[in-house]
């Protein structure tokens, strides 16, 4: 392996969604540098941050059909009973909600938490309040994805925040999806809520850091283990 290949392999790939922003940041840096040279370096720092933001690293995904895997990188900001948003069609009974807050330094690629079929995708316009606030799940712009798994229906909600103003979802209704599959992203700083059945054995607590596609949020069979993994 050449030195160039080694250097290339040591960095996470950049998702194609980021290229327009990276190019725009760099062009603006050049323009600012033409006006006053120190501004170029300020713009270059922002360009490097943009490259980092849109990184899309491979993950080691555990292949256990009884596990619910984190759909987002970030910090677990809420774990507890909550009535899911009405638009998801999951009923009025409480389910377990796990919220993952993604700051501007988190990888913002969202991944499928459990294998199944996409039953519905529901976009809901709204505000752009701080995504860390509990009320963001009710009032902020969001996009809900309902997955019909072998253990029942699970809701995943992408929530825009004060900085994030663009929710992207690549999945479509009736798609068959697998655990760890990329299904969307949110730009720039946001939150992701997941609504799961009450019988799930929780494996995370508030304040814990989660890794999309790897961290086990909960299990339908507390005794189950896995020896199979997928790199993606």
UniProtKB/Swiss-Prot annotation:
Is synthesized initially as an inactive proenzyme. Formation of the active enzyme involves a self-maturation process in which the active site pyruvoyl group is generated from an internal serine residue via an autocatalytic post-translational modification. Two non-identical subunits are generated from the proenzyme in this reaction, and the pyruvate is formed at the N-terminus of the alpha chain, which is derived from the carboxyl end of the proenzyme. The record marks 189-190 as: Cleavage (non-hydrolytic). Its EC number is 4.1.1.65. The modification Pyruvic acid (Ser) is found at residue 190. The keyword Lipid biosynthesis applies. One of its GO terms (biological process) is phosphatidylethanolamine biosynthetic process. Binds 1 pyruvoyl group covalently per subunit. GO terms for molecular function: phosphatidylserine decarboxylase activity. Pathway: Phospholipid metabolism; phosphatidylethanolamine biosynthesis; phosphatidylethanolamine from CDP-diacylglycerol: step 2/2. Its main location: membrane. The active site is at 190 (schiff-base intermediate with substrate). Heterodimer of a large membrane-associated beta subunit and a small pyruvoyl-containing alpha subunit. Belongs to the phosphatidylserine decarboxylase family. PSD-A subfamily. This is Phosphatidylserine decarboxylase proenzyme. It comes from Bartonella henselae (strain ATCC 49882 / DSM 28221 / CCUG 30454 / Houston 1). The lineage of its organism: Bacteria, Pseudomonadati, Pseudomonadota, Alphaproteobacteria, Hyphomicrobiales. The gene is psd.
